[in-house]
Amino acid sequence: MRTISVYLLFMLLTIGITNAQISSAQKVLVSVTDDWNSNTATLYLFDKTGDGWKKHRSVFSVSIGRNGLGWGEGVHPHQSGEYVKTEGDNRSPAGMFELDTLLYGLGEKAPDGVQIPYLPLTKLTRCVDDENSSVYNSIVEEDSLKKDWHSAERMGYVDPDYKYVLVVKNNPLRQPGKGSCIFIHTVNVPTSGCTSMDDEDMLALLRWLDPKKKTVLVQLPLDEYHRLRSEWNLPKLLNN
């Protein structure tokens, strides 16, 4: 009985944390796929209003990991099962994740109309995907610290995919093997785990973001979205 009580308390606490994250968010991106193995998705944007969530007029067709989705490590309760994201599995993370409202890009300055802070990528910018590194799942400048990794993305050379890059906070505790370097970026083709879209759609997304408003990404197969919508207090998808 004590074990059951502790488990129920844990579940209530984790659900409460998830609800707090979505409750404190003022903007949410919802990316839904047909199933776990689909590598395309539909992306909806929602703004919080006094009457609840209001869907933005734009709906985007996007690409995700070429092998589909796997449960990631975000602000949602821990999930297990057949589909769990690991390093190098070519799956995008499923769940709820904070979105870092800092834009990286290949140009010298942000596009017109973008409010969030901008940081140009350099030829030394790396995202470390070596799980044995002390800076695993981190973006660093290679000349700013002692190199202890054997594998990293050379972000300043990834053109045109990294023309614009937003960081999805998957695996923020940087647990080895749980996945690294998950972004939203340009070029709408299936990826190694990121969410990608056409330039025009990416610009619309970037101009919609507000640095003063907390933003989260919810990324799930459609059936899972419907299953969790009430529990996680998610917006209703009017077209589904």
Tell me the role of every PLM-derived stretch.
Residues D198:
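Conserved "landmark" site that anchors the functional core of diverse proteins
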